[in-house]
Amino acid sequence: MIASLRGTVINIGLSSAVIECNGVGYEVVTTPNTLSQLVRGEEALVLTTMVVREDAMKLYGFIDNESREMFSVLQTVSGLGPRLALACESVLSPLEISQAITNADAKALQRVPGVGKRMADRLIVELKGKVAAFAAGVVDEAGEQISLPNANIASEVVVEQVSQALVGLGFSEKQSDDAVSFVLAADPSLDTSGALRAALAKLSGK
C-alpha cells in the first residue's frame, strides 16, 4: 500500500492533485483544505490511503494522520463509501466529527451534503465507541503536515478552492461565488475549512 507521497506538485484540480515522485505522477483525491495547502511547483508530503474497487484504484490524500484515520473509520459505517467520507472531512474536522458523534448531534453531521437524518443517526450509532481517541486528541500524528503558503497565496487559494468545492457539491457558480464573497467579507481570516463551513451554513440558510 502507498502510505505517503513526497514530491513536486505538478497540478491542482477541483478535487485532486498530481504529485510527481521520481518521474511518476500520482493523482491524489483529497479535500479542499488539503488542496489549499499545496502550491504548484513546490514539494509536498501527503499521507495517503488506497481504496481498491472492482472498477478502479484511487489514492486519497491527507495533511495529517488524524484525518487519514478518520477517513478509514468513517468507511466502517454501512452504506458510507470513500466519496461521502471525504465529503465529511471537507466540511468538518476530525475533532468536530468525533464531537458530533459523541454528543449525538445529528444536525451537525447533516451539514455534510449527502448526509441525511438516517445516515447521521447511523454514524452516531455505529461510531460512538470508535471516535473517543479523536475527541480526546490522542490519535498518533505520524508524518509531517504540509507547510502553509504565504498569506496572499493562501487568501487567493481559499476563494478558489471553496468556490470549486461548492460547485462540486452541486451549487451553481453564482451561488458559490456569492457565498464565499459574503463569508470572507465578514471574516477575512477564515481558512479553507472555516470558509467552506460558513459558506455551506449560509447556503443552507442556517
UniProtKB/Swiss-Prot annotation:
Q: List the cysteine pairs that form cystine.
A: none
Compartment list: Cytoplasm
Gene3D superfamilies assigned: 5' to 3' exonuclease, C-terminal subdomain (1.10.150.20), DNA helicase RuvA subunit, C-terminal domain (1.10.8.10), Nucleic acid-binding proteins (2.40.50.140)
Q: Name one GO biological process term.
A: DNA recombination
User: GO CC terms for this protein?
Assistant: cytoplasm; Holliday junction helicase complex; Holliday junction resolvase complex
The ranges of region (Domain I) come to: 1-63
Q: Name one Pfam family in it.
A: HHH_5
Q: What is its main location?
A: cytoplasm
Q: Where is the segment annotated Flexible linker?
A: 143-153
Q: Where is this region: Domain II?
A: 64-142
Q: Does the keyword Methyltransferase apply?
A: no
Kindly state which keywords UniProt assigns to this record, in alphabetical order: Cytoplasm, DNA damage, DNA recombination, DNA repair, DNA-binding
- Determine the domain of life of the protein's source: Bacteria
Which GO MF terms does the UniProt record name?
Answer: ATP binding; four-way junction DNA binding; four-way junction helicase activity
Q: Which SUPFAM superfamilies match?
A: DNA helicase RuvA subunit, C-terminal domain, Nucleic acid-binding proteins, RuvA domain 2-like
Spans annotated as Domain III: 154-206
Which InterPro entries does its entry note? DNA_helicase_Holl-junc_RuvA_I, NA-bd_OB-fold, RuvA, RuvA_2-like, RuvA_C, RuvA_C_sf
Subunit annotation? Homotetramer. Forms an RuvA(8)-RuvB(12)-Holliday junction (HJ) complex. HJ DNA is sandwiched between 2 RuvA tetramers; dsDNA enters through RuvA and exits via RuvB. An RuvB hexamer assembles on each DNA strand where it exits the tetramer. Each RuvB hexamer is contacted by two RuvA subunits (via domain III) on 2 adjacent RuvB subunits; this complex drives branch migration. In the full resolvosome a probable DNA-RuvA(4)-RuvB(12)-RuvC(2) complex forms which resolves the HJ.
Anything noted about its domains?
Has three domains with a flexible linker between the domains II and III and assumes an 'L' shape. Domain III is highly mobile and contacts RuvB.
- List, alphabetically, the HAMAP family matched: DNA_HJ_migration_RuvA (MF_00031)
The similarity annotation says: Belongs to the RuvA family.
Entry function: The RuvA-RuvB-RuvC complex processes Holliday junction (HJ) DNA during genetic recombination and DNA repair, while the RuvA-RuvB complex plays an important role in the rescue of blocked DNA replication forks via replication fork reversal (RFR). RuvA specifically binds to HJ cruciform DNA, conferring on it an open structure. The RuvB hexamer acts as an ATP-dependent pump, pulling dsDNA into and through the RuvAB complex. HJ branch migration allows RuvC to scan DNA until it finds its consensus sequence, where it cleaves and resolves the cruciform DNA.
- From the Swiss-Prot or TrEMBL record, give the protein name: Holliday junction branch migration complex subunit RuvA
* Organism from which the protein derives: Corynebacterium glutamicum (strain R)
Q: Which gene encodes it?
A: ruvA
